[in-house]
From Swiss-Prot:
This is Mitochondrial morphogenesis protein SLD7. The gene is SLD7. It is found in: Nucleus; Cytoplasm, Cytoskeleton, Spindle pole. Its main location: nucleus. One of its GO terms (cellular component) is nuclear envelope. Present with 1690 molecules/cell in log phase SD medium. Belongs to the SLD7 family. Required for the proper function of SLD3 at the initiation of DNA replication. Binds to SLD3 and reduces its affinity for CDC45, a component of the replication fork. Required for mitochondrial morphology. The keyword Cytoplasm applies. InterPro entries: Sld7, Sld7_C, Sld7_N. GO terms for biological process: DNA replication; regulation of DNA-templated DNA replication initiation. It comes from the Eukaryota. The keyword Cytoplasm applies. It comes from Saccharomyces cerevisiae (strain ATCC 204508 / S288c).
Length: 257
């Protein structure tokens, strides 16, 4: 059951002064501990291309919130600025900080099909990368300080490089796995949307989103073995031709065309 979490107001600054976008309601389908709703305040930072965001910006288990507004100004603003499906609006929150770094928290508002959604930027992986870089610098500093005591600079440098290579290899491996899964999702989504358009199925049709979702889920199930191998780091990307054939078969089945 959906529940209203909070209301967001944020400020747009420009040459003509400031404009406040008001009454953006954030709703969640997940249960939360707090039963009271709050008001968040923030300011517009910039527009971003969602396809070019770093992988650490979004985690696989993060919350995505539905956004609604009864404000005509807010509705007109989002309609104008989010025409591009890959565009996002970055908002810096005044009243909320990242618990780990105590840095400002950020929301990204975007449009998915006909729905307006948002998510909070996940800084967890960024902090892990920063921590690894800091540790590597500390290790190198300790190594240099103890060169004269150890008496063998070659061994010390080799040990330091091995530690760096091991850490980088693990990070690159995880990033590579995430890239493959993200590419699968993006390709699958584009194929489904293209297939629906070719069949003359408009997103204004009542069952459009339902048809999109069941096709997406069925395609994931069809390629579950390949996705499992990808998640273990031992599989190749699902080929475009294979995924296209799967989508065509499913759409023929679901649309009876």
């Amino acid at each position: 059951m959906s529940r209203k979490l909070c209301t967001l107001n944020f400020t747009l600054s420009g040459k003509q002064g400031s404009l406040v976008i008001r009454d953006i309601q954030l709703w969640s389908n997940r249960p939360t501990a707090s039963k009271s709703t709050s008001e968040l305040r923030g300011q517009f930072i910039q527009y971003v291309d969602l396809a070019k965001l770093p992988l650490w910006v979004r985690s696989t288990n993060m919350n995505t919130y539905r956004c609604y507004s009864t404000s005509a100004t807010a509705q007109a603003y989002f309609k104008s600025k989010l025409r591009n499906a890959n565009r996002g609006i970055v908002i810096e929150l005044f009243d909320k900080v990242d618990q780990r770094s105590q840095e400002p928290a950020y929301l990204i508002i975007f449009r998915e099909n006909t729905e307006l959604n948002c998510f909070q930027v996940d800084l967890t992986m960024k902090h892990e990368f920063d921590g690894q870089v800091t540790k590597l610098k500390q290790d190198i500093g300790k190594t240099r300080a103890s060169v004269s005591k150890e008496g063998s600079i070659d061994i010390i440098i080799q040990q330091s490089q091995q530690r760096k290579i091991g850490t980088k290899t693990e990070v690159y491996r995880n990033v590579h796995i995430n890239d493959k899964r993200l590419q699968f999702n993006e390709t699958l989504s584009k194929l489904i949307l293209g297939g629906l358009r070719l069949r003359g199925i408009s997103n204004s049709i009542t069952d459009y989103q339902k048809l999109y979702k069941i096709t997406f889920d069925a395609a994931e199930f069809t390629h579950r073995d390949e996705l499992k191998r990808i998640s273990m780091g031992s599989g190749e990307e699902v080929s475009f031709e294979s995924l296209q054939e799967t989508v065509e078969t499913l759409l023929k089945l679901f649309t009876k065309s």
